[in-house]
Regions:
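Penicillin-recognizing serine hydrolase domain
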Residues: 20-168
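Substrate-binding clefts and substrate-entry loops adjacent to catalytic sites
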Residues: 4-17, 44
Length: 168
């Protein structure tokens, strides 16, 4: 759910389950980022909401994402268009969750036919951000856009992909 619809409460739950507190989990995230070479990143929460001490770069997001894409489980979620949460002993019905990354949704105007998967994010200070993978003519690219506005969030990524696919 966290990757498909930015369910920030799920991020907090994951952090508390793994590390006891969100602060401790953020320390683990920062440590792992540094191990991946993402040296201009510091996490202070598990969901990305603004904090002066919570920061990253497009390059660092690329490095972190490339590491994730080495995992089959990560790729399965990264490329998922939807997920059905099964019924439990607490909730008797299933719940369908759809990916909110519009470049992946065929019925939307922002759809990009070569997009494989991705993650979006937004808050007032960061603007609209997206990390997206696309494949065309056997070539796979990863694009990170940051600080976009609503009108250009997906156009920015598409323009970058098209430029890179054209000028190998």
């Amino acid at each position: 759910m966290l990757m498909l619809v930015s369910a920030n409460d799920v991020g907090v739950g994951i952090a508390e389950h793994i590390s006891g507190t969100e602060v401790e989990f953020a320390k683990l995230m920062t440590k792992r980022a540094k191990e991946l070479g993402a040296n201009n990143t510091n996490f202070v929460n598990s969901h990305g909401y603004h904090d002066e001490n919570h920061y990253t770069t497009a390059r660092d997001l690329m490095l972190i994402t490339l590491a994730g894409l080495k995992s089959e489980d990560f790729v399965r979620v990264w490329e998922a268009l939807e997920y059905t949460v099964p019924a439990t002993n607490k909730v008797s019905r299933t719940t369908k969750i759809k990916n909110i990354h519009k470049m992946l949704c065929e019925d939307l105007s922002q759809y990009y036919e070569y997009a494989l998967g991705g993650k979006t994010g937004f808050h007032d200070d960061a603007g609209r951000c997206a990390i997206t993978t696309a494949k065309k003519d056997g070539r796979t690219l990863l694009c990170v856009t940051m600080k976009s506005n609503k009108a250009n969030q997906y156009k920015d990524g598409e323009k970058l992909f098209e430029y890179c696919f054209k000028y190998r």
